[in-house]
Amino acid sequence: MAKKDYYDVLGVERGADEKEIKRAYKKLAMKYHPDRTQGNKELEEKFKEIQEAYEVLSDKQKRANYDQYGHAAFEQGGFGGGGFSGADFGDIFGDMFGDIFGGGRARQRVVRGDDLRYDLEISLEEAVRGTTKDIQINTLAHCDSCDGSGAEKGSKVETCSTCHGAGRVRRQQGFFVTEQVCPSCHGSGKKIEKPCKSCHGDGRVHKKKNLSVKIPAGVDTGNQLRLSGEGAAGENGAPNGDLYVVIHVRDHHIFERDGSNLYCEVPISFTMAALGGEIEVPTLDGRVKLKIPAETQTGKLFRMRGKGVTSARSAYAGDLICKIIVETPVKLNEEQKALLRQLEESLEGSSNKPKSSSFFDGVKKFFDNLGK
């Protein structure tokens, strides 16, 4: 099968300079590296093709031969002779993996402690007004017995001779460079003569920790509070992680919350709905009087401004929205039933019951039209 043009393989123009060729190669090599393609044979062949193209175009003499004779310059007995000798890919892969593996020099591994999560349930009143809650977490803490060194007091702690304190070692196979945890010190970068009996050489121990968490006013379900440095202890003296407290507000028996607004259902008698009156409704600040106008229907909303929640991100309080539910009387005695029948007979159609009259007139028209 005919070979592709090396310039096309790297995606560069024929007049590209050395920097452009190197940049193009690095980008493609990173994309098609076998560590990323996970055994895909087609992509492995693509990677070999990219390497072959770079080896030729990065070498001035080979590039000149290729520009003059094409692929024939490197065929057995061809004009250029010599085949492929293996270009110096070390600096290329050193650059590529430098950011991932900490640059070209070995450095001791510093691993920040894990972040932790704590789910905290609070009442609506606590969420609205703010509160302080005591919590207990399970965490990895600095070992007091060895002061975090991992070694028994008086025991020697030496730098690991395999990784020279880096905690990781590099392996080079041809022009491939890989990095892995040091097998001698298991990533700690040190050799301990006598490990601490409390932490078994880790420098950290599992323990329960008590904390007081200040909950600001206006929080809601899903809000997170970050307690900096209250997570797990880091390795080898690295910083602690953070603790994230996730708020969950319990359902309330009266109010429902939607952002800064509160909602509640207010039942009233059908006589009050018809005649009007005044009732007391609950708010988080106490009882407030609400005037019910005559002829109020079920579902009517009354907005009480400023009686909602002041959220953690706003200086303004939301509203309390009361939904009226007209309650039908139940368990009536015979006398009460007779009074209601008498009332029903006294009510005129459209003037006293406009919605009922309108509805049934509409139903009649519907069936009349259906029969035509």
Curated annotation (Swiss-Prot):
A zinc finger (CR-type) spans 130-208. CXXCXGXG motif repeats lie at residues 143-150, 160-167, 182-189, 196-203. Zn(2+) 1 binds at residues 143, 146, 196, 199. Binds 2 Zn(2+) ions per monomer. Pfam families: DnaJ, DnaJ_C, DnaJ_CXXCXGXG. It is found in: Cytoplasm. Keywords: Chaperone, Cytoplasm, DNA replication, Metal-binding, Repeat, Stress response, Zinc, Zinc-finger. GO terms for cellular component: cytoplasm. Belongs to the DnaJ family. Homodimer. This is Chaperone protein DnaJ. It comes from Pasteurella multocida (strain Pm70). The gene is dnaJ.
